[in-house]
């Protein structure tokens, strides 16, 4: 079973959101990176870009496919992980840590997102 930390919330598209001191850090889940396989390219929005919950904010390309990354929250991107763009395999190696993707201004509604237990059940249902 893929790792599912309790300190963040999750989408049905397999993204995570973690509040961090006035911002929401976003990434893809361990399950997502496992399904994608070896990630070879990451495209992220520049700081200042407005993102909308449920809409694509970037993409990841693996040796298997190209997949959109959907924003779990609405707001303005305040930071992107340049390391994930220049070293995409970090998303495979550490999806919940060094492989984060963007940070968005806090304040977006997260009520539609699942907690870890609900996400675990969702993944197990397949």
Predicted segment positions?
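Short aromatic-glycine motifs in intrinsically disordered, low-complexity regions
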Residues: 63-67
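Acidic, low-complexity mobile loops and tails
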Residues: 1-56, 89, 93-126
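Histidine- and aromatic-rich ligand-binding microenvironments
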Residues: 68-72
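Short, loop-centered acidic/histidine patches that primarily coordinate divalent metals
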Residues: 74, 80, 107
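Conserved hydrophobic positions within beta-strands
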Residues: 14, 60, 74-77
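Short, conserved catalytic or interaction motifs in soluble domains
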Residues: 62, 82
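Short amphipathic beta-strand starts and helix->beta connectors
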Residues: 83-88
């Amino acid at each position: 079973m893929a790792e599912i930390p309790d300190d963040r919330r999750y989408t049905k598209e397999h993204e995570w959101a973690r509040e961090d001191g006035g911002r929401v850090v976003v990434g893809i889940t361990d399950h997502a990176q496992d399904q994608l396989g070896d990630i070879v390219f990451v495209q992220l929005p520049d700081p200042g870009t407005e993102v909308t919950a449920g809409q694509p904010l970037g993409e990841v390309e693996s040796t298997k496919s190209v997949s959109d990354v959907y924003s779990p929250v609405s707001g303005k991107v305040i930071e992107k992980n340049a390391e994930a763009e220049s070293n995409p395999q970090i998303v495979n190696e550490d999806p919940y840590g060094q492989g984060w993707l963007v940070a968005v201004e806090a304040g977006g509604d997260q009520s539609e997102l699942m907690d870890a237990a609900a996400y675990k059940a969702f993944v197990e249902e397949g």
